[in-house]
Amino acid sequence: WYSGMFAPNIKQEPISHHHHHHHAHHSHHQHPHDSNSNSNASSPHQSPLPSPNPPSNTILQLEQYLKQQQQQQQQQQQQQQQQPMDTLCAAAMTPSPSNNDQNSPLMLPGLPNPMQSIMLANLRPSPTATTTTTTPAAAPTTTAAAIALQANDKLQALTPPMDVTPPKSPAKSQQSCAEPEKEHDLMSNSSEDMKYMA
């Protein structure tokens, strides 16, 4: 119903409405003639509205509505800053060998960006927060970075044996099933290459 009530006002008188909409409190209290001009100016295009009171009330409601939206946007921005660290930690903790080749190159350049922004954000309000790691402000960032880095190192350390161990198990099974060594070599090479290429 906001758009329905404000559509005629905005179309006919966008400048004055915009001014009063942003400075409703100041204009009404500090400048009485402004409030009078507002009621007089809004009276011509008040045909859909019953009285001059709804515009002032709806303007106040709109200001509160805008303030709520700004607060929500700030909360969303804070959540977005926290999300990269959580997603990075989650990606680092998932021990999936198939996605590791895709995650490891993305995570190495991806880790410094959120960490730098968080550390800079801590440096601006209180430099001591970063120097003393025991403070709660710096502790989450350092621990999260350490966890992500440790998990990333563990994944990278696990990938060479994981790439080596799977070929051994099919090689044993193929040795028992396929007697000819030539067929075993062709099968193991082609199947292993196809597995890790895909």
Curated annotation (Swiss-Prot):
Subcellular location, record wording: Nucleus
Basic residues composition-biased segments: 17-31
Domain of life, source organism: Eukaryota
GO cellular component: nucleus
Keyword rRNA processing: no
Organism this protein belongs to: Drosophila disjuncta (Fruit fly)
The protein's name: Protein hunchback
Protein family according to the UniProt entry: Belongs to the hunchback C2H2-type zinc-finger protein family.
Biased segments, Low complexity type: 35-46, 68-83
GO biological process per UniProt: segmentation
Residue stretches of biased makeup (Basic and acidic residues): 179-198
Stretches the record annotates as Disordered: 16-117, 152-198
Primary role: Gap class segmentation protein that controls development of head structures.
Biased composition regions of type Polar residues, renumbered to the chain: 95-105
MF annotations from Gene Ontology: DNA binding; zinc ion binding
Keywords: Developmental protein, DNA-binding, Gap protein, Metal-binding, Nucleus, Repeat, Zinc, Zinc-finger
